[in-house]
Every structure is written in C-alpha cells, then in structure tokens.
Amino acid sequence: MLRKVFYISDGTAITAEVFGHAVLSQFPLEFDALTIPFVETQEKAEAVKAQINDCFITTGERPLVFHSIVKAEIRDIIYSSEGLDYDFLNTFVAPLEKQLGVAAAPALHRTHGKANESYEARIDAINYAMENDDGQTMKHMDKADLILLGVSRCGKTPSSLYLSMQFGIKAANYPFTEDDMDNLKLPEALKRNKHKLFGLTIDPERLHEIRHSRMSNSRYSSLRQCRVEVKEVEMLYKKERIPYVNTTNHSVEEIATKILEETGLKRHMF
C-alpha cells in the first residue's frame, strides 16, 4: 500500500504541493497524494483532521501532512491530527522574524496576490504562444519575448506553452523542416529578431524514437533523416551564434529553466 500524503492549505495549496513534491521526489517511492485547498474554517479543518485520522486507523501508518496554513486556529487543528506535520510557512517565519527584526503579519492568500495582478499578462502570453506556435504566422515575431527554434518534435511547443503559462513569457516557436535542409537559413522575420532566438536540439536517436512512435516507416522518422536535420540545424546555430540547449532526457521544467538561465529573461510571475 502506498504511503498517504496530504497537501493542505487555507489558500490554493499550490505552495504546499510544490514544496511537498520537491521533498518527496528525493525518495525512490510512490505516494498516494490528496490535495485539500481552501480549508478556511474550523469546521473544514475538523473534517480534514478526521480524514487524516481515518487514514491512520485504516493503514496503521501516520500520513505525511504538508501544509501552508496562515490561520493559527486552523493550523492547530491540523497539528492535533495523527499525521506527521511538515509546516512550511511557520518553519521559516520565526527565524526570519529574528533576522528581519519585524514581527510577521500573516494575511490569507497574500502569497498568491501577484497572480491576480498578472492574470491578464498570463492569458496574453498563453494566447500569443498558441497563435505563434510552429511557425503558423511570422507577423507578430516583433512582439515575442523569446523565439524557440528547432527541428520537428524536439520540444518547442511544450516549452513555449510552459514558459507562457508558468512565467508569462511570450514565446513563439519556429520549426526547421525536411524541405529547409538543402538551403538552411534564417527567414527575414527571424533575422530581425535575432537577439530573441534560442535553439533547441536533441540526440538523433531520441528524435528517431519520438517520430517513429507517431509516423513509423516514413522518411520523416528514419534515423538517417533525423541525423541530417539535427546536424544541419546545429551547424546553423553555430554559424549564426544562436545559443541552444539539448532537450534529450530533460523535462519541460528543466528545459524552461535552462532557457531562462541562458537568456536572462525575467520571470513575469511566480
């Protein structure tokens, strides 16, 4: 039976989830997780406490409880459960009070207030990424914060969407296709925005696996074609001095982080 994990908050529970996932990912185990947001009343807290206690009685193991609860009276109810408590907010508050010389003034949902302020920017960035995906149009490249380049199936679209959704970055992407290989060069719209260009590449063998799973027994998915495309595109990156990263065996989160690190782009939101 998988160890039970609770992510609890009097807000969205995003903070508890992020920290909890980061900690638990250090262990080669699987967990049965339940997220419970908006535990804003003592009645709700008592109901959650009952869930935790029932889980302990059923499994004989104390559930792991990751929480970020601002209200002390609600937090105390969760503390009194049979769960093993990991309280992220208050673990850091007391030491910081000493360092800053200021008493904390907790405010519910303050941690996500910036999300409300930047909601429109996030939506604009997502819409931009979708409208400028895979070279659908070259008309709005001047408005991009970032333009990703690469062969088909190297990770351009998921990276663009992740950057827009997570950080509010307007990320366009442009594909280099088989037809481009004989005379590979940057289109004029990309030349005008060369300072925004960032390349993605991938190991040919991995590219072959990805394409083969979608279009087997085609020239497009052949290992030879994958090798040709990757080689030509990497040569273009070097010729044009375009920074690039290899996406092989990296998650979209890791790819996005590498892009931000290399480009110095500012995260528009957290």
Swiss-Prot record:
ADP binds at residues 150-157. Its EC number is 2.7.11.33, 2.7.4.28. It comes from the Bacteria. It holds the Pfam family Kinase-PPPase. GO terms for molecular function: ADP binding; ATP binding; phosphotransferase activity, phosphate group as acceptor; protein serine/threonine kinase activity. It is an enzyme of class 2 (transferase). It catalyses: [pyruvate, water dikinase] + ADP = [pyruvate, water dikinase]-phosphate + AMP + H(+); [pyruvate, water dikinase]-phosphate + phosphate + H(+) = [pyruvate, water dikinase] + diphosphate. InterPro entries: Kinase-pyrophosphorylase, PSRP. Keywords: Kinase, Nucleotide-binding, Serine/threonine-protein kinase, Transferase. HAMAP family: PSRP. Bifunctional serine/threonine kinase and phosphorylase involved in the regulation of the phosphoenolpyruvate synthase (PEPS) by catalyzing its phosphorylation/dephosphorylation. Belongs to the pyruvate, phosphate/water dikinase regulatory protein family. PSRP subfamily. PANTHER family: PYRUVATE, PHOSPHATE DIKINASE REGULATORY PROTEIN 1, CHLOROPLASTIC. This is Putative phosphoenolpyruvate synthase regulatory protein.
